[in-house]
């Protein structure tokens, strides 16, 4: 089959590789009908994610049709159309039972790698480095789905892929970002980053009862989408002082909750931005935490920071004094896929949400390299690139 | 005389002690989740024969006898005289608080011999026998909770194309 393999920073190649096979009784094989680049794939593309090996197949946001099931797959059958969670959970460990799917104890065969850097291993993720399990990704014609009964959710036929594809990863990630805010009546939620995850976080904040939502970015088309799709108010951080503007918009209180939908390659400004960029370039700091710092200062006293933007390693110059003395709550994590996916599928089927609006560009899988370049540099006002293997 | 090496490792498994105990008590099950233990053959109620494989198909073998057996709580075993390597081990099952399952603690002690067998064991267990026992226990947990051991052996990649 054809697959998109990583060979180093900014080096992805379409190659012919063997088809996947069932390796464990709870596996299924999926024919990928649609898959899309996630912002976190750019961290891999840019070479910031360790334990990648040349030849690894990328991709973790996808859907398709089940073509084969292992002996212990009970709920799914050949022919089922499914949306697949980017995060892999066994469904039987204590964490999965608590619905904390990304903390699964049993889905990461290379758990020991994470134990060394994080203290404990966490769940496997498709196409996201060997430390996260080394699972082959979805930028391929076929993919093996471990623990398929939980990792994949059956969806009806007759609704286009575009409307369901973001339910694999971007939508539940944004939804969890809002869910972690414990939104109360009257709450104002600010979201840093108006990419796909940020769009879904803003929209989800309203679904969960926010009074007002404010989106922060610098790209006009993304801010426009935040206004049109998520019905958010917007701030362009290149045009205004974000801290001042947020205070003015919230009666001086600051947003009740702040969501980070940006992550480790945040675009900082001024000397602070240069400092992080330089330190990250020579690997003295793995992540650029500009957004985190700003959220701590912006957030209402006693408010909540919800951190979804992916971080991998270390950050420095964190204003912990501000966080501590303002009594902030930090909540974060990789998304708990199967906890949210069925509910979000319902929202799509009911017509509450049309996630397809974030998918601005479609390419065949063979043009993956162009897709990455277009997405990375936001060419042609690109927000999200969808690949179709056929 | 070399010094004996003792390794202790604990994992919490979300299953009742009775289920974990009875799986472990059938020593033939152990090679299903241990990396180096190739075969355990039960000879009698409290005696079994254990085989470890090493590099170049070398093997280390011994007979072990059960020295303590408390159903659903503890199993302890010890190699009998004449073993390739003198060793002893135990596994203990203790309820974790608040319905968090069972804490499973493994203790192994062995006296590394010299010569060929000593070299082989050193290669097998490297500098971190704790890591090896920990990985074995992680696989035991996967098998008990998830019913299978997570793997990627045999999946596709473009690795074979990466050298051109």
Annotate the PLM regions:
Chain B
Residues 1-49, 53-55, 134, 139-164:
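Hydrophobic ligand-binding cavity/cleft-lining segments
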Residues 4-10, 47, 61, 74, ...:
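Intrinsic-disorder/low-complexity, polar/charged segments enriched in Ser/Thr/Lys/Arg/Asp/Glu/Gln
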Residues 15, 54, 68, 95, ...:
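Non-catalytic surface loops within mature trypsin-like serine protease
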Residues 43, 67-69, 92-98:
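Short beta-strand micro-motifs enriched in acidic
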Residues 48-55, 75-82, 106:
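Short beta-strand segments that buttress and anchor functional surface loops
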Residues 52-65, 69-72:
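Short hydrophobic interaction/assembly module
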Residues 60, 78-137, 141-142, 146, ...:
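Beta-strand/loop substructures that line and gate deep hydrophobic ligand-binding cavities in soluble
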């Amino acid at each position: 089959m054809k697959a998109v393999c990583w060979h180093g920073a900014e080096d992805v190649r379409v190659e012919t590789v063997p088809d996947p096979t069932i390796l464990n009784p709870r596996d299924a094989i999926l024919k990928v009908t649609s898959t899309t680049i996630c912002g976190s794939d750019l961290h891999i593309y840019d070479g910031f994610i360790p334990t990648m090996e040349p030849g690894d197949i990328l991709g973790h946001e996808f859907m398709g049709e089940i073509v084969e099931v292992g002996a212990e797959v009970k709920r799914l059958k050949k022919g089922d159309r499914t949306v697949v969670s980017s995060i892999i959970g066994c469904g039987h460990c204590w964490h999965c039972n608590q619905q904390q799917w990304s903390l699964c104890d049993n889905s990461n065969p290379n758990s020991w790698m994470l134990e060394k850097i994080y203290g404990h291993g966490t769940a496997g993720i498709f196409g996201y480095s060997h430390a996260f399990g080394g699972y082959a990704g979805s930028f391929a014609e076929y993919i093996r789905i471990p623990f398929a009964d939980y990792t994949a959710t059956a969806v009806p036929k007759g609704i286009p892929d575009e409307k369901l594809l973001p339910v694999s990863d971007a939508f539940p990630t944004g939804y969890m970002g809002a869910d972690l805010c414990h939104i109360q009546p009257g709450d104002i939620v600010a979201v840093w980053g108006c990419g796909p995850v940020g769009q879904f976080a803003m929209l989800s904040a309203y679904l969960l009862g926010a009074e007002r939502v404010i989106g922060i970015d610098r790209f006009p088309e993304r801010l426009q989408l935040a206004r049109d799709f998520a019905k958010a108010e917007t701030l362009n951080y290149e045009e205004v002082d974000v801290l001042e503007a947020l205070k003015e918009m919230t009666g001086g209180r600051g947003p009740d909750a702040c969501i980070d939908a940006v992550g480790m390659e945040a675009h900082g400004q001024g000397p602070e931005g240069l400092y992080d960029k330089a330190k990250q370039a020579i690997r003295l700091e793995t992540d650029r935490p500009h957004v985190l710092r700003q959220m701590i200062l912006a957030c209402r006293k006693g408010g909540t920071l919800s951190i979804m933007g992916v971080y991998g390693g270390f950050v420095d110059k964190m204003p912990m004094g501000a966080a501590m003395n303002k009594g902030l709550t930090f909540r974060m994590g990789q998304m708990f896929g199967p906890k949210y996916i069925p509910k979000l599928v319902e929202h799509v089927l009911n017509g509450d949400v049309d996630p397809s609006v974030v998918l601005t560009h479609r390419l065949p899988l063979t043009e993956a390299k162009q897709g990455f370049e277009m997405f990375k540099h936001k060419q042609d006002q690109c927000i999200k690139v969808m690949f179709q293997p056929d | 005389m070399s010094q004996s090496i003792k390794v202790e490792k604990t994992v919490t498994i979300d299953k009742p002690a009775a289920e974990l105990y009875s799986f472990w008590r059938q020593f033939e099950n152990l090679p299903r989740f241990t990396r180096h233990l190739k075969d355990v053959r039960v000879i009698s109620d409290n005696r079994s024969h254990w085989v470890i494989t090493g590099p170049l198909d070398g093997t280390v073998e011994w007979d072990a006898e059960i020295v303590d057996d408390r159903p659903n709580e503890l199993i302890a075993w010890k190699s009998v005289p004449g073993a390739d390597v003198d060793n002893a081990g135990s596994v203990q099952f203790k309820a974790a608080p608040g319905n968090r399952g069972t804490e499973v603690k493994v203790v192994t002690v062995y006296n590394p011999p010299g010569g060929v067998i000593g070299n082989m064991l050193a290669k097998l267990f490297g500098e971190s026998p704790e890591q090896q026992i920990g990985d074995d226990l992680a696989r035991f947990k996967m098998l008990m909770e998830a019913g299978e051991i997570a793997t990627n052996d045999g999946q596709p990649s473009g690795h074979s194309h990466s050298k051109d």
